[in-house]
Amino acid sequence: MPSNAHRPDVPAARPDSPASGSPGSVSPAGPASAVGPTIDLNADLGEGLGPWSMGDDDAMLEIVTTANIACGGHAGDPSTMRRALASARARDVAVTAHVAYPDLTGFGRRFVDMSPQDLTDTLIAQIGALSALAAAEGTAVRGVKPHGALYNAIAHHEGHARAVVDALSTPAHTSLPLVAAPGAIVAGLAEDAGIPVVLEAFADRGYRPDGTLVPRREPDAVITDEHAIVDRVLMLAVDGQVRAADGTLVPVRAQSICLHGDTPGAVHLAGVVRSALEHEGITLRSAV
């Protein structure tokens, strides 16, 4: 279990916290089931490239339960990947392959109009590269989470959603769960193909009333207020809902919550979030 080294003081408990096993609790998709509400905290890590680095991976790995490691699409060279894998293994943190469009220049935040077959092939290569390095470190990739523009596109782009499912349907990857947004086309296609799906929500992203994320180019796309983020995470973990940018309460069934590790104060904020969840009696455990 990650240590408490980076966790600040715990916020006050919510008076409306449910008892263990209440209807508001969220059950993860992992292999074992804990008593009471359980949630996974994941972060995107290993997003450096050569001499350039992003975020404090080691500090985040003391807090999160799953690390999504970039594997060459938007970031991540072999040495960066292997260092991140070694750090995750040392802290007993589960690893997913953070696959992306082949877009190093745009950090994977631009849609790439490529054929589904080409996309499938590049995703197989990315997962394979991280898996090979994981094996060299005596560990294994336990899931796949798309990044950036790919994550957003496969919520509605059926061709690219099927390409992701095809990549996970190859013999080498059939046991890997897919991390996806609730209601995304890719989630339904993956379930139809027999691929386990872990549903995810975001601690610091704005939501629309329909449950989709507010695009980054629009106001209210990113939440920066610490108290608002803690309230968001507790509402997700306990009540299974979020408050949209217009104030609407939106049902969001999530087994994992993403904490971005590349924003200012990310480590402090992640520690506050983890402490708040533990103070509410919520078990932190990987969902992959």
What are these language model-derived features?
Residues 44, 98, 144, 259:
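Conserved, mostly hydrophobic/aromatic
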Residues 53, 57, 66-74, 105-120, ...:
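Glycine-rich tight-turn/loop motif centered on a GG-T
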Residues 176, 270-288:
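C-terminal domain-boundary segment and adjacent tail
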Residues 183-241:
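Active-site rim beta-loop-alpha module in soluble metabolic enzymes
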